[in-house]
Amino acid sequence: MGTDSTELSEFEKQRLANIAERDALLKKLTLDAQSSGIFPPKLARSSPVSQTKPKKKPAPKKIKKEGEAPVARRMSSRLRGIAAESEVAKRKAEEHYEAVQQAERAKRVRKSDAFSFSEMLVSGQKLSADGLIGVDVVTKGVAMPYQRTFGDEDIEKTADKELKRLREEVSGLQLWEAWEPNRIKVTPERIYTMTFHPSEAKPLIFAGDKMGNLGVLDASQERPVSSIKHEDGDEEEQEDDDDPDPVLTTLKPHTRTISSMHIHPSKPTHLYTASYDSSIRELDLEKTTSVETYAPDSPSDDVPISGIDMAADDPNTLYWTTLDGAFGRYDTRASRRTAVATWQLSEKKIGGFSLYPTHPHFFATASLDRTMRLWDLRKLSHDDPLPVGEHLSRLSVSHAAFNSAGQVATSSYDDSLKIYDFGAKGIASWEQGHTLSDAEMKPDTVVRHNCQTGRWVTILRPQWQANPQSHIQRFCIGNMNRFVDVYSSSGDQLAQLGGDGITAVPAVAVFHRSKNWIAGGTASGKICLWM
C-alpha cells in the first residue's frame, strides 16, 4: 500500500510539471502573436448614451507660424546610431537636460526693459485709453459645491432693520448676464490677484495670473445681437459667428506670478503690478506701456514680492512685502539706491499686508509663522524691528486687510476669519512707542470659514470695500462651495453670491472701492461679476 501511494505521488508530480510547461508555452506563443500584430485590437463597446451625444465641434486646424522652430521629436539612441550605455549617449542626455533647464530658467528671469503694448500683448484687442478708463477721474472645512450656508431665510430672520436692508441690497446683486462665467476667460492660467479700476462710470477689472499674464475685462460691453440669417452652411459655424465671446485683452508684463495690484485713486491711469519675479511695474493705461518701477539691483537676485500697497495721501511711495519675510518702502521720485528702505520683519514668508488707510504709518502683516502683527513705521528699527503687538493663530495666517475704521480682517488655515478692532482701541491717537498686550491683541470677532484651498485653488484672502456707501464696513472673500461671501465688520454675513455657470471656486474676490460691484476669479482664469 505504501509503494502504490509513493508511485502515485511521483506520477502526480510529473503531471503538474507537464501542465506548467504547457502553460508557459501557450503564454509565450500568445505574446509572440500579439507583438507580431496577429491578434486584432479590442473594439470599444458602443453604448446607447454615447450615440445620443451631440456632435462635438471639430478642433480648429493648427497653422504653422513662419519662423517657428520645429518641435523636437523623440528618437531612440539606436536610430540615432548611438551605442547603448555609451559615453556619447550619456553626454548627449546630459546636454539635452541642461539645455531644457536653461530654457526654463530664461523664461523666469526678470525682464527690466520697458514694454510697449505690442510687446506685452498675448491675446485680445488693442486697448483704447478713452474706452479703457471710462473717464471719471465651522469645523475643518470640506468643500460642498453649490451648498449654501446663507440665504433668504437668514435675511428674513434679521431683527436689525439697517442690517436687514443691507443684507437685502447685497444679496440682490445679480451675476453679469451678458456672458456665462465659463466664457469670460481673461488669463491663460490660475488667477492670483484682481482689482477694479476706481472709475464709477463702468466696471473695469484687472486680473493677474500664475505665469505673469494680466487680463483686462471691460464689463460695460453688451452682447451683440446678430441679425444675419444664413440659408445654408454649417449650423455650428453660424452659431459661433452669431454669438461671439466677450472682448478681452491679455498682456504679459511679468515673467512669473503677479501677486498683487494697486491703482491709486489720484493716478487712475496707472496700474502697479507686483510679481514673484521680484519686480514692481507701472502700466500706463493711456499709453499702454509698462516700465519697471522697482526691482533688486542685480537681475539674479530672487526676492519674490507677495503684496503691494500705497498710502491714500501719497501717490508716489510704494510699500511691499516679500516671500522672504521683508517689508520695503520706496519713493519713486528719488534715486532708487538712496530711497529704498527695507526691514526684515519675519523669518518666514509674509503672505499679505495692508496699510491703515487714514494713518498709513500703521500696517498689519500676515505670516506663515502663524502671526498677525501690527507695526508702526514711525518707530521701526532696521536692526531689531518690534511690532506694536502680535496675535498667534493655530495655523498660518494668509492675509491681513485694514479698513478705514481701523479694523483688520485676517484669513487663516485654522478655518477662521478674525476681525481685530483697533479703531475701538484708539489707534488713531496712539503715540510713537505705543504697544499692546497679548490680551489686547486678541480678535474681537471670529467667524468659521473653510480656508482649505489645497494645491490648485488660490489662497482665500479678505478684501474690504474702501469707501462703503453706509457706515457698515463690509468685506468679501471666496467660498470653497463656489460662492463669494460678504461679511460686515461685526462678523454678520451679508450675502452669499453665486449663480448658474460658476464651475469653479471664485477664490480671488474683490470689491469695487465705492460701488457694490464684486468680482471673483477662478483657477481656470475665468471671472464672475456681480452688480
UniProtKB/Swiss-Prot annotation:
Region named Disordered: 37-83, 218-264
Record-level Gene Ontology MF annotations: DNA binding
Metal-binding among keywords: no
Cross-referenced InterPro entries: WD40/YVTN_repeat-like_dom_sf (IPR015943), WD40_repeat_dom_sf (IPR036322), WD40_rpt (IPR001680), WD_repeat_DNA-damage-binding (IPR050853)
Gene Ontology cellular-component annotations: nucleus
Keyword Repeat on entry: yes
Record field: compositional bias (Basic residues): 53-64
Keywords from the named record: DNA damage, DNA-binding, Repeat, WD repeat
Per-repeat ranges for WD: 186-227, 253-293, 300-340, 345-385, 392-431, 454-497, 500-531
Acidic residues biased stretches: 233-245
Bilayer-crossing regions: none
GO biological process, one term: DNA damage response
Function: DNA-binding protein that binds to both single- and double-stranded DNA. Binds preferentially to UV-damaged DNA. May be involved in DNA-metabolic processes.
Family: Belongs to the WD repeat DDB2/WDR76 family.
Protein name: DNA damage-binding protein cmr1
